[in-house]
Amino acid sequence: MSVRYPLLNRELGILGFNERVLAQAADPQVPLLERLRFICITSSNLDEFFEVRMAGLQEQIRDNPGALTPDGMSLQHAYDLVVERAQRLVHRQYTMLHETVLPALEQEGIYFHASDSWNDEQLEWARRYFLDELLPVLTPIGLDPAHPFPRVLNKSLNFVVELEGRDAFGRQAVMGIVQAPRALPRVVRMPHALSGFEHGFVLLSSFMQRFVGELFPQLVVKSCNQFRITRNSELFVDEDEITNLRVALQGELPARHLGNAVRLEVSADTPLHIVRRLLEESELGDKDCYRVAGSVNLVRLMQIPDLVDRPDLKFTPFTASTPAVIANAPTMFDAIDAGDILLHHPYESFQPVLELLQQAARDPSVVAIKQTIYRTGTDSPLMDALMEAARNGKEVTVVVELLARFDEETNINWASQLEAVGAHVVYGVVGHKCHAKMMLIVRRVVQAGKASLRRYVHLGTGNYHPRTARLYTDFGLMTADQKICEDVHHVFQQLTGIGGELTLHELWQSPFTLHPRIIESIRAEIDNAQAGKRARIVAKMNALLEPSVIAALYEASQAGVKVDLIVRGVCALKPGVPGLSENITVRSIVGRFLEHHRIYYFHAGGAEDVYLSSADWMDRNLFRRVEVAFPIRERKLKRRVIAEGLSVCLGDNQSAWQMHSDGHYRRRRTGKTIRNAQLGLLAKFCS
């Protein structure tokens, strides 16, 4: 593939984002237990990176080794660069954990007891715990011709045990494998009286390394080392052949745990000949092995902040606010009738969204509810409200995206429950994930003695997920605007029925009008700049990768348009290149909350067009998903979006990272006045 304009590598960009996340763990301004949490978040992110992106890169190398990446590199060269950077990131992560965070936790009375440090009383307690709580659940597998190497599950914790001696059948014992069931706790609290610390913990791996011999009686344990294999987790569903997507997915999900191996993690002290055996059994090369100084699964340490009652070592709790127009209105419908409502999560509560749906479920005047679901969690009051509405006789239609990655099983379960109470459940459009966030309520109202149907809509940039609504930054709009409601009705009509493309008047929708409208809006700014008028583009999103949009932004810069991009994650555009992109800046905000809203601002000759959306500027969002972008017309709300979503990020000099033309980021901590976008909004909205 020839590249007309320069692009940056996607995989390297994802690793760059995770480097910025890990930097939070090194920041002394971040509370200590939150620093530990950021180390764990980095591990979780890397797991998905290997399961999806690295797995895909390995497949491309196998299938088409001569191909190039979108940024023009050979696949093998790109893979080598990504592996090298990933290895550095993992090394930095474990160094930070062991040399900075764990010693600081020990100073605060939070300690992890390694097995080689146990005194006699601690040893006896640990032995009893192993025999009573762990041993009955563990299954040792001895390796011999009758017991081949097991195909260990994706991301499971395993132990490879080197043995010596003969077993009860006279067989020479060489090696055994023990897989730790997911039900076993990875972290166990040691009784306070034994620990000597306020909060003492023992890792499951410490129990195993000390007592694994109990699983192999009368044999000598020469070594016991933990390992973990990450597998390709993409689901393979032939969308052209299936007749029932849910049934096809249910058949495919179990295979996710047994896909091709893409990464081997082993403890640093694992003997080389054992590492070789593990790589051979996994069909991996030396570059795919990550030797780590400690636990091979740091994600499980994420529970420590929840187990330790030390508010002084965590982010200050906050109570999200509720807009006065909602608090003072008899019902959510009355509040929306008074005018459009903008909610800015997590600073403003997600509860009004739940209340809107709950009131709709119980209101005898409501006749129909339509809802999209992408991610909502396993325990969702929103889904409970939809089922209540169906039981109450409402016409409930839910578009459940079954292919939401890693939420497929949860969404299948919700779809079954919804159908059981009489709701209409559809799975969107085969070949196009439904990522749009839409709720439509149809209510019978009486005005001046005349009955009519009135529509109410909620549109959002984030998922209908109460838990992540406290962790992600997102905007939501509640409106009864007739044009927007009509457009949302048409989108639902497309999702649930069959027919031609319907004309939308206010919304931009992918895969139809969203990409053309973005390009047209950029072109309009170019025209204004060339005519000597003011021209400006500000856009905020999670990722920027789509080549034609990037090309248009480069052309805008060359025409003199000032372009400010706030891209949390990967960005393939190179800013600040003379003659190409010197008028473009790119920054990334990484802080307490995950920046998640997508905002498109175009100066538009002074009209200032502002759109909110669920769509990043990526190929998949613009061409292979159903997404919507919706306008903010009301002046006061528009000023809020510009101020709270864009200006605070552009002015941030604490959690902002500035991207340079080589693709590297540097923390932007300049100026005498401290400006932190998220902390400023917390202070403005929350108590």
UniProtKB/Swiss-Prot annotation:
A Pfam family hit: PP_kinase_C
EC identifiers of the protein: 2.7.4.1
CDD domains named among the record's database cross-references: PLDc_PaPPK1_C1_like, PLDc_PaPPK1_C2_like
InterPro entries documented for this protein: PP_kinase, PP_kinase_C_1, PP_kinase_middle, PP_kinase_middle_dom_sf, PPK_C_dom2, PPK_N_dom, PPK_N_dom_sf
Listed cofactors: Mg(2+)
Family, as annotated: Belongs to the polyphosphate kinase 1 (PPK1) family.
Enzyme kind, highest EC tier: transferase
Active-site residues per Swiss-Prot or TrEMBL entry: H435
Posttranslational modification: An intermediate of this reaction is the autophosphorylated ppk in which a phosphate is covalently linked to a histidine residue through a N-P bond.
Reaction catalysis annotation: [phosphate](n) + ATP = [phosphate](n+1) + ADP
HAMAP family, alphabetized: Polyphosphate_kinase
Residues where Mg(2+) binds: R375, R405
Name of the protein this chain belongs to: Polyphosphate kinase
GO function terms (MF aspect): ATP binding; metal ion binding; polyphosphate kinase activity
Record-listed ATP binding positions: N45, Y472, R568, H596
